[in-house]
């Protein structure tokens, strides 16, 4: 285990907090190392088998939840509402696709966010930017915005509560498509939280104990970076966001690092191209990965490439643009011989107005805006996004 940690720590790690009290970081990491794993190896194996079915075209995935989770929303009522929305969207997706649907939440650990800037100006004051509840506070006060390592422990405890409320108490023993707890996932970002939760079972298998299904984002997918190094070592299925600027060579090198044995369902690529770029940029990438022999699941993130600023000054996204990208995504993937496996959405069960239906609705954005970071789809908007899959053309599979 020490050798693994050394290999990861010698790599460059981007988007990491600058903790204000190093002694508190030491204590927090010790707590995380001594705490129980949030997930079990047997569940990882079940999830990998389930995702292999998706990679074979036998099931679909709906992955959704908050952009940034609120650690104060770890009580049963909050978790129940989020799980109910996931169930509703999965049911809708099942009707649309006529296939079983794997339910995955952006939940029980989505407490940190990468940011473009280190600071922001609020009025006349320059403050550290908010990086998620696991790192610092939201209030526009310097004391709240300092990076506080004690929040790592709060994040673990909140995730533990959420896991229990989701129903992860008893061994699974079967492939979980319906009638069982939703799988958990989050962006594997803060290594001071993730590394102490790396575990090794009796058979010597290394796994990440913080979540069932970790992913890395556009800002941390560097081939020689610490995040890729860690994902390459763990038993968990893994995922990576893919934007319009990645080259075929970069993507193939990334796939080789994360999926060297070409195992179906081991690696999922989450395309976040933007509605106006996906048709041109995605097909060559899908074809290159297919020809390299990787049994990849492709998911569409139709939100992050389509963020704009509303008249009120808040970030927003238009549902029309989101559905346009979903339609273009599926056509791009299936025409290139890939497996279009489902959707990755930022959603909330609350009746918010963070996303607009179209350009005419931009003036309504902000009247009910509660997101801690990026705009989310409310339930009706999320259903519209899921239904957009039905408008896509049927697959035309291409053999290797």
Swiss-Prot record:
Gene3D superfamilies: Aldolase class I. Signal peptide: none annotated. Its EC number is 2.5.1.54. PANTHER family: PHOSPHO-2-DEHYDRO-3-DEOXYHEPTONATE ALDOLASE, PHOSPHO-2-DEHYDRO-3-DEOXYHEPTONATE ALDOLASE 1, 2. InterPro entries: Aldolase_TIM, DAHP_synth_2. The keyword Transferase applies. Pathway: Antibiotic biosynthesis; phenazine biosynthesis. GO terms for molecular function: 3-deoxy-7-phosphoheptulonate synthase activity. It comes from Pseudomonas fluorescens. Keywords: Antibiotic biosynthesis, Transferase, Virulence. The keyword Transferase applies. It comes from the Bacteria. One of its GO terms (biological process) is aromatic amino acid family biosynthetic process. It catalyses: D-erythrose 4-phosphate + phosphoenolpyruvate + H2O = 7-phospho-2-dehydro-3-deoxy-D-arabino-heptonate + phosphate. It is an enzyme of class 2 (transferase). Belongs to the class-II DAHP synthase family. This is Probable phospho-2-dehydro-3-deoxyheptonate aldolase.
């Amino acid at each position: 285990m020490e050798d693994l940690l050394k290999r990861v720590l010698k790599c460059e790690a981007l988007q990491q907090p600058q903790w204000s009290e190093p002694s508190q970081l030491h204590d927090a990491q010790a707590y995380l190392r001594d705490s129980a794993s949030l997930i079990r190896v047997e569940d990882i194996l079940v999830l990998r088998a389930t995702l292999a079915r998706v990679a074979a075209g036998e099931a679909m995935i709906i992955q959704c939840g908050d952009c940034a989770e609120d650690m104060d929303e770890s009580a049963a009522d909050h978790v129940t509402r989020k799980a109910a929305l996931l169930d509703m969207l999965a049911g809708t997706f099942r009707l649309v696709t006529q296939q079983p649907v794997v339910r995955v939440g952006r939940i029980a650990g989505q407490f940190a966010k990468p940011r473009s800037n280190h600071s922001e100006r609020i009025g006349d004051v320059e403050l550290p930017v908010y990086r998620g509840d696991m790192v610092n506070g939201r209030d526009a006060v310097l004391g709240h915005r300092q990076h506080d390592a004690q929040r790592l422990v709060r994040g673990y405890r909140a995730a533990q509560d959420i896991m229990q409320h989701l129903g992860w108490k008893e061994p699974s023993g079967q492939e979980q498509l319906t009638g069982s707890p939703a799988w958990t996932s989050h962006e594997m970002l803060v290594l001071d939280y993730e590394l102490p939760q790396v575990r090794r079972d009796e058979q010597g298998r290394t796994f990440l104990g913080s979540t069932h299904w970790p992913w890395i984002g556009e800002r941390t997918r560097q081939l020689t970076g610490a995040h890729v190094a860690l994902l390459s070592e763990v038993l968990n299925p893994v995922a990576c966001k893919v934007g319009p600027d990645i080259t075929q060579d970069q993507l193939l090198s990334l796939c080789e690092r994360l999926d060297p044995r070409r195992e179906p369902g081991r690696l999922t690529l989450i395309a976040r191209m933007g509605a106006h770029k996906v048709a041109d940029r995605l097909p060559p990438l899908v074809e290159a990965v297919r020809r390299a022999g990787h049994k990849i699941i492709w998911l569409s993130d139709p939100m992050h490439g389509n963020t704009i600023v509303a008249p009120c000054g808040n970030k927003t996204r238009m549902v029309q643009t989101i559905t346009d990208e979903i339609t273009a995504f599926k056509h791009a993937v299936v025409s290139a011989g890939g497996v279009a496996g489902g959707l990755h959405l930022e959603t909330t069960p609350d009746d918010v107005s963070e996303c607009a239906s179209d350009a005419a609705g931009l003036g309504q954005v902000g009247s009910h805006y509660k997101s801690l970071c990026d705009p989310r789809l409310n339930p009706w908007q999320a259903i519209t996004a899921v239904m957009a899959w039905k408008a896509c053309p049927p697959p035309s599979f291409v053999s290797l």
